[in-house]
Structure formats: C-alpha cells, structure tokens
UniProtKB/Swiss-Prot annotation:
Organism per entry: Bacillus licheniformis (strain ATCC 14580 / DSM 13 / JCM 2505 / CCUG 7422 / NBRC 12200 / NCIMB 9375 / NCTC 10341 / NRRL NRS-1264 / Gibson 46)
One GO BP annotation of this record: nucleoside metabolic process
NCBIfam families tied to this protein: PRK00451.1
Reaction(s) catalysed by this chain's protein: N(6)-[(R)-lipoyl]-L-lysyl-[glycine-cleavage complex H protein] + glycine + H(+) = N(6)-[(R)-S(8)-aminomethyldihydrolipoyl]-L-lysyl-[glycine-cleavage complex H protein] + CO2
Name under which the protein is recorded: Probable glycine dehydrogenase (decarboxylating) subunit 1
C-alpha cells in the first residue's frame, strides 16, 4: 500500500532496488570514491510541532526591519510606495493566483484581458506603440532590450551610461558575454551622462545607447539631447524608466526612444527582500515582431464579441523551439496584474498626484539637508532621489539611524568607488515632514 505522505517507504525502496537489480542503495554511489563520501549524521534539529515551529518562525521574522515600523529612505531601484488595499484582494483570487501561461484563450479570457490592460497602461505611460505582457524585472528587461538591438542592427557594441543602475549593468554584461557583445560604459558628469563622452563612444559598430530616466542618482537625463547621439550611425535608443516618474515626465517615446524598459515595482508590488518584481518592455511598431515575451492582442470571436488571445506566437519557444526570438517562459503575470490593479485604482489623476508628492517631498528633503549643513552632491532636475555627502562612512550613519527607527539611504561607495561617503536618499509619498526632518537632523548632527 502506498503511503499518502512519505515519498519512499521501505517497501517502495525495496521494490525499486529489485527493479534495477541492486541490493543496497549504497551500490548506486559506487562510482564515488570512499574518501570523498560524506559519512555520519546531518546536523538537523529534531522535529517540532506546528505551534512550536510557528512561534520560532515568528520570533525569527521579528528581527526583520520593515517599512511599517521604520521610515524607509532606501530606494536605488526598490521603493516604499503605497499599495492600494484592493491589490491583494484581486491577485489572491484563485483564478489569477494559480494561473499559468494562457495557451487556451477560450478558457483564459480574464487572465488575457488583465494582461492586455497592463500592456495598454504601459504604452500610455511610456508613449510607445507596443508593450509585452511583462519581463522578470527591470534588469533583465534592459538586457533583453540590448539583445534585441544587437540582433536588429546586427552590431556588437552597446554603449551604456554609468548613471544606469549598477546591478542592471551587471545583468547586461552577463547577457552580452554569451553573445560576444562589447559593453562600453560611459562616465557621468555632475550626476548625468557625459554627453561628450557619450558622443565619442558611439560609432558605426554601436547597436544601442542606454540611459536611465530618472537615472540612478535621481537626476533627469536630457533625453532630447541624447537622442541625436544615440541615433548616430543608425544605432538604437534604449531608455530604462521609472514608470511612476512617467506620471509627470515627458514619455520617452515622445523624445525619440526606440525601446523603453523598466520595473513596475512602484505600482502595487512590495519590496519583499528585492523580489519578485515585474519588468516591462515597450517598443515602436517596427520592432513588434522582435519583442521578447508574450503579447496579448484584442480580436473578435465568430459572434462578433471582443476577445483576447496570445498573438504573434511564432516568435516563441513553444512554437519555434531553438529558433525562437523569445525565450521568456513563465513570466511575471501575477505581478503585472498587481501593477495593473494599482494603476487602475489610482487612475490617471492618482498616478500624477503620487508622482507629484514624490517630487515635492524629495525637493523638501533636499532643502532640509542643506539647512542641516549637509552637502548635496549633484544639483539639477530630479524626481524622488538625490545624493548627499557625509563626513562619516554611510554604513556607520545607517547603523545609527536604525536606532531612531529610520532605514537610511543607499551607500553609493559600494558601486562607485569615487563616491565613498555618499548616500543616495529616496523620498516617496509615504514619508512625512517629521520623518524627513528627523533624518536630516540626525545626519546633520554628525556632519558638524
């Protein structure tokens, strides 16, 4: 009789060994030398009851620093934003929560329409023609954009500003290495891309130029000035954008971008130790057939009713296998749904209002930093992040801030050696005047 819970009872093991003609399990490992085999018992704790285990895990989880008890000024790609209550209610519905790739449209209309709405909203924010159903995160979306550009132009050089998120650049390099693509990083000047250096780096062999908007330091890159440089030599212009900032800023599509990517985390997706997230990928119409990931299209059924289907599937690996131009398997559809619900709940006015609050509160925080005697590293247009210079290591300052129930900013010295003792501060709509003043006063006291 098979046991309901144990995967391999003694009887199961006996039957399997007899079937393969082996007497003992040890014989299966005869190829492994005795000298390197592990012998003895694993140091595993004794089994606990459910109540004991729950208490232990609750105690362990209490050690985490959350953004409810603590005021978070940590951004650098993952932000503490308001999540409409309705988001969790919708994504927890079983038909969404357990849904996989909707290959059969006749039984997946709800899922397909939700993805279609996500694509529509991303196009509205970015000013682009086509959006896919989602990517894994902002970093992989950026790397996939570079691969698309290289394949489309048949060129093997990618020029990227060092003001692009350092982790996204690392993902890009990982992708590029396997494709023998050369990644050239261009230095910054006063917190934005150095346009002269960018112009010098772009040549006839350049497949694409990549910038971030707003960039990693919080500054607004001059896309209008970068566009002619990026398109020099028929290379492509890729912009990695914060979707919330696009509630206020001119869309990259209106400024000449060929591909716009980013991470939808600001909309309805919690920080959650860095993931999972939801990348987005939007392009001009001419690149539609080269977009990675799934595309949901609108159509009509035989009765003339509106319906939704996976379209242009010939690009994908379940159709073309090794010749596919898209190799995204199970995408982030659930997180895309969360982002869609959040954007819908906020509406156009709500997205703009939250973006405006981010801008205003960050501007107030920057002035508060100056009043506290702190030096702001880069002056100029910004969104919700800026950089200050400290007289002490950022790590030390952040340890002290934790005692005041504040999660401090990102240590830029970890990614930029010339910016040691520089802190990247993020200010979202959730931060209060009192929290901002407390942060700056604490940092200012140690700056004197």
């Amino acid at each position: 009789m098979k046991h309901r819970y144990l995967p391999a009872t003694d009887q199961d093991k006996k039957e399997m060994l007899e079937a393969i003609g082996v007497e003992r399990i040890d014989e299966l490992f005869s190829d492994i030398p005795e000298s390197v085999r592990f012998k003895g018992e694993y140091q595993i704790k004794k089994a606990k009851s459910e109540t004991e285990l729950t208490k232990e895990l609750t105690k362990l989880a209490a050690k985490n620093k959350d953004t409810v008890t603590y005021a978070s000024f940590l951004g650098a790609g993952v932000y503490d934003h308001y999540q409409p209550v309705i988001v969790d209610h919708v994504i927890s519905r079983s038909e969404f929560y357990t849904a996989y790739t909707p290959y059969q449209p006749e039984i997946s209309q709800g899922e397909l329409q939700a993805i279609f709405e996500f694509q529509t909203m991303i196009c509205e924010l970015t000013g682009m023609d086509i959006s896919n159903s989602s990517m894994y995160d902002g970093g992989t979306a950026l790397a996939e954009a570079a691969m698309l550009a290289s394949g489309h132009t048949k060129k093997k050089k990618i020029v990227v500003s060092e003001t692009v998120h350092p982790e996204s650049r690392e993902v890009l390099k990982t992708y590029a290495k396997g494709q023998y693509i050369d990644v050239v990083e261009v230095p910054s000047k006063n917190g934005t891309a150095d346009l002269e250096a960018l112009d010098e780096a772009v040549c006839e062999d350049t497949a694409a130029v990549i910038v971030q908007y707003p960039n990693f330091f919080g500054r607004i890159e001059p896309l209008k000035d970068i566009k002619p440089i990026a398109h020099k030599g028929k290379s492509m212009f890729i912009v990695s954008a914060n979707p919330l900032a696009l509630g206020l800023l001119t869309p990259p599509g209106a400024l000449g971008a060929d591909i716009v990517v980013g991470d939808a985390q600001p909309f309805g997706i919690p920080a959650a130790f860095g993931g999972p997230h939801c990348g987005f990928f939007a392009v001009t119409k001419k690149l539609m057939r080269k977009v990675p990931g799934r595309l949901v299209g609108q159509t009509e059924d035989e009765n003339g009713k509106r319906g939704f289907v996976l379209t242009l599937q010939a690009r994908e690996q379940h159709i073309r296998r090794d010749k596919a131009t898209s190799n995204i398997c199970s995408n982030q559809a659930l997180n895309a749904l969360a982002a869609s619900v959040a954007m819908t709940a906020l509406g156009k006015k709500g997205v703009k209002e939250i973006a405006w609050q981010n801008l205003q509160k960050a501007a107030y925080a920057k002035e508060a930093a100056k009043r506290a005697g702190l030096e702001v590293a880069f002056e100029g247009p910004m969104f919700n992040e800026f950089v200050i210079r400290l007289n002490e290591p950022v790590e030390k300052a952040n340890e002290r801030l934790l005692e005041k129930n504040i999660i401090g900013g990102y240590d830029l010295g970890a990614s930029y050696p010339d910016l040691k003792r520089h802190m990247l501060i993020a200010v979202t709509e959730l931060r209060t005047k009192e929290e901002i003043d407390t942060l700056m006063n604490e940092l200012g006291d140690c700056h004197e």
